[in-house]
Amino acid sequence: MTDPDRFKDALLAELQSLRAFAISITGNVERADDLVQDTVVKAWTNMNGYTEGTNIRAWLFTILRNTFYSDFRKRSREVEDDGAHASRLAVHAPQHGHMDLEDFRRALAQLPDDQREALILVGASGFSYEEAAEICGCALGTIKSRINRARARLGEMLSVTSGADFGPDADSYAALAGADAGGAKAD
């Protein structure tokens, strides 16, 4: 039998990670919050199904993932908001960097569900490849392949050609280089 107090503490410790993962797979904060709530209720109800000493984080993420796919099947007839009205209301500040966060979010949303999920579990949620494979219910090699394909596809969609695409733009880099050179002369 699982100790309710320790179970509650472990569950509460994972709420932020569960919410972040839920937001990333749903693309909608309200649905993500509902998904986390459903996950917590299911986990608490099935507390005795959890084996103490095993990875509670992986167990919770598996519940969340399974709940998401069950809800997805139920909501398959809902019409999604394409953001057309919101895009006319919001104006983004001019960016000097090569990559805008919204560009990344759009590209991430275009990945196949299995690739996006694998990438988020390992890249953003900090799970090992083995843990992600367990959560997704697939082989380790499958997770590695999904992540590799997701990274390659994101690179294509975002026109990333090198690591420099993630760093400062040319103007910022020149300013930083000039500051370094100026600092070296002062010595």
Spell out what each predicted region is:
Residues D38-N55, K74-S76:
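Sigma70-family region 2
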Residues T51-E52, T62-D82, G97, R149, ...:
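Arg/Lys-rich amphipathic alpha helix in sigma70-family domain 2
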Residues D34-V41, T54-N66:
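Structural recognition of an alpha-helix C-terminal capping motif at a helix-to-coil junction
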Residues R6, I135, A152-D187:
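C-terminal edge and immediately downstream basic/flexible tail or linker adjoining helix-turn-helix-like DNA-binding
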